[in-house]
A protein has these predicted regions:
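An N-terminal, well-structured beta->alpha segment
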Residues: 1-67
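Ferredoxin-reductase
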Residues: 42-111
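A short, terminal or domain-edge coil/loop segment
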Residues: 24, 94-102, 124-132
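Ser/Thr/Gly-rich flexible loops in soluble cytosolic domains mediating phosphotransfer, phosphorylation
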Residues: 110-132
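Generic alpha-helical secondary structure signal
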Residues: 28, 80, 118-121
Length: 132
């Protein structure tokens, strides 16, 4: 397991980011994450494992869309189905939201592999992009 570090809201490791305790409970923090990741990819697919996480799904997707990027959403989907489907939409980044208690956001490249440490470090150190 490779621990990369933390920013205000997330701990970054192994192709995912996990919310720090007491953070990312509101939509504005999740939208900020969406604006941040929008600067690194062109087309996104975002999904969540159950309806408990839809507010985070919508907020991240909103942040991405604010920056003029395409985002496809999958509500209430299992990870294998999500990983199979998003490359068919030509998405170059997959965002999967899961977790009980803390939010875990798994990030995948266009080939269904977890994002590399270099990209995660860039996300961790980057600030939110400007809306289009």
């Amino acid at each position: 397991m490779s621990y990369l570090g933390e920013n205000r809201h997330f701990s970054f490791r192994d192709g995912c980011c996990e919310s720090l305790s007491g953070t990312v409970s509101n939509s504005s923090d999740a939208a900020e994450f969406g604006r941040t990741i929008a600067g690194h990819f062109k087309r996104f697919a975002a999904g969540c494992e159950n309806f408990d996480h839809t507010h985070i799904l919508y907020a991240i997707s909103s942040g991405i869309a604010e920056c003029g990027k395409d985002v496809f959403m999958y509500e209430n989907t299992e990870l294998p189905s999500f990983k199979f489907g998003y490359p068919l939409l030509s998405a170059d980044c997959g965002i999967y939201i899961s977790g009980n208690g803390s939010i875990r956001i798994s990030l995948f490249d266009e080939s269904r592999f977890p994002l590399c440490d270099r990209t995660l470090t860039a996300l961790m150190d980057d600030s939110a992009g400007e809306p289009a």
